[in-house]
Amino acid sequence: MAEWPILVMVLQEILSMRETEPKMDLLAIDDFDGELQQLIDWAIRMKNDDGFADSFKPLDGMSIGSIYEKPSTRTRVSFEVGVSKLGGQPLTLLANDIQLGKSESIADTAAVLSRFMDGITYRCFGHSDVQELAKHSSVPVINALSDMHHPCQAAADLMTISEKIDSVKGHVSWVGDGNNVLHDLMLACASLGIDIKYATPIGFEPDADIVSRAVTMASDLSLIHI
Protein backbone atom coordinates (compact mmCIF):
# COMPACT_ATOMS: atom_id res chain seq x y z
CA MET A 1 0.00 0.00 0.00
CA ALA A 2 0.93 3.66 -0.23
CA GLU A 3 3.74 5.21 1.73
CA TRP A 4 2.37 7.82 4.11
CA PRO A 5 3.67 10.89 2.17
CA ILE A 6 1.29 10.35 -0.74
CA LEU A 7 -1.62 9.88 1.66
CA VAL A 8 -0.57 13.03 3.49
CA MET A 9 -0.86 15.01 0.27
CA VAL A 10 -4.14 13.32 -0.70
CA LEU A 11 -5.59 14.26 2.68
CA GLN A 12 -4.28 17.81 2.49
CA GLU A 13 -5.57 18.36 -1.05
CA ILE A 14 -9.06 17.02 -0.38
CA LEU A 15 -9.53 18.58 3.05
CA SER A 16 -8.20 21.98 2.00
CA MET A 17 -11.30 22.19 -0.19
CA ARG A 18 -13.80 21.05 2.45
CA GLU A 19 -15.48 24.47 2.50
CA THR A 20 -15.93 24.65 -1.28
CA GLU A 21 -19.22 24.10 -3.07
CA PRO A 22 -19.52 21.41 -4.09
CA LYS A 23 -17.11 19.70 -1.69
CA MET A 24 -14.33 17.59 -3.20
CA ASP A 25 -14.30 13.82 -2.75
CA LEU A 26 -11.69 11.33 -3.97
CA LEU A 27 -13.56 8.26 -5.18
CA ALA A 28 -11.40 7.56 -8.25
CA ILE A 29 -8.02 8.95 -9.28
CA ASP A 30 -9.44 11.15 -12.05
CA ASP A 31 -11.25 13.21 -9.41
CA PHE A 32 -7.97 15.14 -9.11
CA ASP A 33 -8.55 16.51 -12.63
CA GLY A 34 -5.05 17.60 -13.64
CA GLU A 35 -3.56 18.03 -10.15
CA LEU A 36 -2.08 14.54 -9.78
CA GLN A 37 1.49 15.41 -10.84
CA GLN A 38 1.64 18.32 -8.40
CA LEU A 39 0.39 16.06 -5.61
CA ILE A 40 3.09 13.47 -6.39
CA ASP A 41 5.80 16.15 -6.46
CA TRP A 42 4.70 17.51 -3.08
CA ALA A 43 4.58 14.02 -1.57
CA ILE A 44 8.17 13.35 -2.67
CA ARG A 45 9.23 16.69 -1.18
CA MET A 46 7.54 15.88 2.13
CA LYS A 47 9.24 12.48 2.24
CA ASN A 48 12.71 13.94 1.66
CA ASP A 49 12.47 17.27 3.52
CA ASP A 50 12.18 16.70 7.27
CA GLY A 51 11.94 20.41 7.99
CA PHE A 52 9.01 20.85 5.64
CA ALA A 53 7.26 17.75 6.97
CA ASP A 54 7.68 18.88 10.58
CA SER A 55 6.18 22.33 9.96
CA PHE A 56 3.37 21.42 7.53
CA LYS A 57 0.28 20.88 9.75
CA PRO A 58 -2.83 21.78 7.70
CA LEU A 59 -4.99 19.29 9.65
CA ASP A 60 -4.21 20.84 13.03
CA GLY A 61 -7.34 20.57 15.18
CA MET A 62 -9.16 18.29 12.73
CA SER A 63 -10.48 14.75 13.24
CA ILE A 64 -10.52 12.20 10.41
CA GLY A 65 -12.66 9.07 10.67
CA SER A 66 -11.62 5.93 8.80
CA ILE A 67 -14.16 3.14 8.25
CA TYR A 68 -12.79 -0.33 7.48
CA GLU A 69 -15.16 -3.01 6.21
CA LYS A 70 -12.13 -4.99 5.02
CA PRO A 71 -9.11 -5.86 7.16
CA SER A 72 -6.10 -3.67 6.47
CA THR A 73 -2.48 -3.36 7.53
CA ARG A 74 -0.69 -0.95 5.18
CA THR A 75 -3.70 1.22 4.32
CA ARG A 76 -4.70 1.68 7.95
CA VAL A 77 -1.16 2.43 9.13
CA SER A 78 -0.57 4.83 6.24
CA PHE A 79 -3.75 6.80 6.88
CA GLU A 80 -3.22 6.99 10.64
CA VAL A 81 0.39 8.10 10.25
CA GLY A 82 -0.58 10.52 7.47
CA VAL A 83 -3.30 12.21 9.51
CA SER A 84 -0.99 12.45 12.53
CA LYS A 85 1.86 13.89 10.44
CA LEU A 86 -0.48 16.65 9.26
CA GLY A 87 -1.45 17.49 12.85
CA GLY A 88 -4.85 15.79 12.80
CA GLN A 89 -6.49 13.18 15.02
CA PRO A 90 -7.21 9.83 13.30
CA LEU A 91 -10.17 7.75 14.46
CA THR A 92 -10.36 4.17 13.15
CA LEU A 93 -13.81 2.54 12.96
CA LEU A 94 -13.83 -1.19 12.24
CA ALA A 95 -16.91 -2.86 10.77
CA ASN A 96 -17.81 -4.56 14.05
CA ASP A 97 -17.41 -1.33 16.02
CA ILE A 98 -20.24 0.63 14.38
CA GLN A 99 -23.84 0.09 13.29
CA LEU A 100 -23.19 0.49 9.55
CA GLY A 101 -25.10 -2.19 7.67
CA LYS A 102 -26.88 -3.36 10.83
CA SER A 103 -29.29 -0.88 12.37
CA GLU A 104 -28.00 2.14 10.43
CA SER A 105 -27.83 2.80 6.71
CA ILE A 106 -24.87 4.31 4.86
CA ALA A 107 -26.81 7.59 4.67
CA ASP A 108 -27.36 7.57 8.46
CA THR A 109 -23.69 6.84 9.10
CA ALA A 110 -22.60 9.63 6.75
CA ALA A 111 -24.89 12.13 8.49
CA VAL A 112 -23.65 11.20 11.97
CA LEU A 113 -19.94 11.17 11.13
CA SER A 114 -20.25 14.47 9.25
CA ARG A 115 -21.29 16.14 12.51
CA PHE A 116 -18.16 15.01 14.35
CA MET A 117 -15.49 14.55 11.67
CA ASP A 118 -13.74 16.91 9.27
CA GLY A 119 -13.23 14.14 6.73
CA ILE A 120 -13.97 10.43 6.22
CA THR A 121 -12.01 7.63 4.57
CA TYR A 122 -13.82 4.43 3.65
CA ARG A 123 -12.40 1.01 2.78
CA CYS A 124 -15.34 -1.00 1.50
CA PHE A 125 -16.49 -3.78 -0.81
CA GLY A 126 -18.88 -2.28 -3.34
CA HIS A 127 -17.95 1.00 -5.02
CA SER A 128 -21.57 2.08 -4.85
CA ASP A 129 -21.20 2.14 -1.05
CA VAL A 130 -18.46 4.78 -1.04
CA GLN A 131 -20.45 6.74 -3.62
CA GLU A 132 -23.48 6.60 -1.31
CA LEU A 133 -21.41 7.72 1.67
CA ALA A 134 -20.00 10.66 -0.28
CA LYS A 135 -23.48 11.61 -1.48
CA HIS A 136 -24.84 11.94 2.05
CA SER A 137 -21.70 13.25 3.78
CA SER A 138 -21.27 16.98 4.22
CA VAL A 139 -17.49 16.53 4.67
CA PRO A 140 -14.98 15.20 2.12
CA VAL A 141 -14.80 11.44 1.56
CA ILE A 142 -11.71 9.54 0.39
CA ASN A 143 -11.98 6.06 -1.10
CA ALA A 144 -9.44 3.92 0.76
CA LEU A 145 -10.32 0.94 -1.50
CA SER A 146 -13.41 -0.38 -3.21
CA ASP A 147 -13.96 -3.24 -5.63
CA MET A 148 -13.73 -0.80 -8.56
CA HIS A 149 -11.15 1.84 -7.55
CA HIS A 150 -8.06 2.24 -5.36
CA PRO A 151 -6.90 5.81 -6.06
CA CYS A 152 -4.38 6.18 -3.25
CA GLN A 153 -2.58 3.00 -4.28
CA ALA A 154 -2.33 4.15 -7.90
CA ALA A 155 -0.97 7.52 -6.76
CA ALA A 156 1.59 5.78 -4.55
CA ASP A 157 2.68 3.51 -7.42
CA LEU A 158 3.31 6.51 -9.66
CA MET A 159 5.11 8.29 -6.83
CA THR A 160 7.48 5.32 -6.52
CA ILE A 161 8.08 5.28 -10.29
CA SER A 162 8.79 9.03 -10.19
CA GLU A 163 11.37 8.49 -7.44
CA LYS A 164 13.18 5.73 -9.33
CA ILE A 165 13.41 7.35 -12.77
CA ASP A 166 13.79 10.94 -13.95
CA SER A 167 10.38 11.08 -15.59
CA VAL A 168 7.29 8.89 -15.68
CA LYS A 169 6.68 10.00 -19.26
CA GLY A 170 6.93 6.91 -21.43
CA HIS A 171 5.41 3.50 -20.85
CA VAL A 172 3.95 1.60 -17.90
CA SER A 173 3.15 -2.11 -18.17
CA TRP A 174 0.74 -4.15 -16.04
CA VAL A 175 0.56 -7.94 -15.83
CA GLY A 176 -2.22 -9.45 -13.72
CA ASP A 177 -5.96 -9.26 -13.29
CA GLY A 178 -7.90 -6.17 -14.28
CA ASN A 179 -8.58 -5.04 -10.73
CA ASN A 180 -9.20 -1.79 -8.89
CA VAL A 181 -5.54 -0.74 -8.97
CA LEU A 182 -5.30 -1.21 -12.74
CA HIS A 183 -8.46 0.85 -13.17
CA ASP A 184 -6.93 3.84 -11.41
CA LEU A 185 -3.51 3.35 -12.99
CA MET A 186 -5.14 3.57 -16.42
CA LEU A 187 -6.94 6.77 -15.47
CA ALA A 188 -3.83 8.22 -13.83
CA CYS A 189 -1.62 7.42 -16.81
CA ALA A 190 -4.16 9.02 -19.11
CA SER A 191 -4.11 12.14 -16.92
CA LEU A 192 -0.30 12.33 -16.84
CA GLY A 193 0.33 11.55 -20.51
CA ILE A 194 1.79 8.06 -19.95
CA ASP A 195 1.21 5.14 -22.30
CA ILE A 196 0.08 1.99 -20.49
CA LYS A 197 0.04 -1.59 -21.71
CA TYR A 198 -1.76 -4.28 -19.73
CA ALA A 199 -1.88 -8.07 -20.00
CA THR A 200 -4.79 -9.72 -18.19
CA PRO A 201 -6.08 -13.32 -18.28
CA ILE A 202 -9.24 -14.07 -20.22
CA GLY A 203 -12.20 -13.38 -17.96
CA PHE A 204 -10.21 -10.98 -15.77
CA GLU A 205 -10.15 -7.93 -18.02
CA PRO A 206 -10.58 -4.41 -16.59
CA ASP A 207 -14.02 -2.85 -16.53
CA ALA A 208 -15.00 -1.75 -20.04
CA ASP A 209 -16.51 1.55 -18.89
CA ILE A 210 -13.29 2.53 -17.12
CA VAL A 211 -11.23 1.61 -20.17
CA SER A 212 -13.51 3.87 -22.18
CA ARG A 213 -13.03 6.70 -19.67
CA ALA A 214 -9.26 6.39 -19.93
CA VAL A 215 -9.35 6.35 -23.72
CA THR A 216 -11.57 9.45 -23.74
CA MET A 217 -9.20 11.27 -21.39
CA ALA A 218 -6.14 10.51 -23.54
CA SER A 219 -7.09 10.04 -27.17
CA ASP A 220 -3.48 10.59 -28.27
CA LEU A 221 -1.99 7.96 -25.95
CA SER A 222 -1.65 4.20 -26.18
CA LEU A 223 -3.78 1.99 -23.97
CA ILE A 224 -3.04 -1.49 -25.24
CA HIS A 225 -4.47 -4.82 -24.09
CA ILE A 226 -2.02 -7.63 -24.81
Predicted regions and their residues:
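Active-site cofactor/substrate anionic-group-binding motifs, chiefly glycine-
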Residues: 63, 68-115
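Conserved small/polar residues in nucleotide/adenosyl-binding loops
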Residues: 224-226
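Anion-binding alpha/beta catalytic cores of soluble intermediary-metabolism enzymes, centered on
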Residues: 110-111, 118-188
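Glycine-rich phosphate/diphosphate-binding loop of Rossmann-like nucleotide-binding domains
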Residues: 69-81, 165-222
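Short, structured coil segments at secondary-structure junctions
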Residues: 86, 116, 136-137, 192
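Short, acidic/turn-prone active-site loops that include or flank metal/cofactor-
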Residues: 96-98, 145-150, 201-204
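Positively charged, low-complexity intrinsically disordered leader regions
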Residues: 17-77, 81
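One-carbon transfer enzymes
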Residues: 1-16
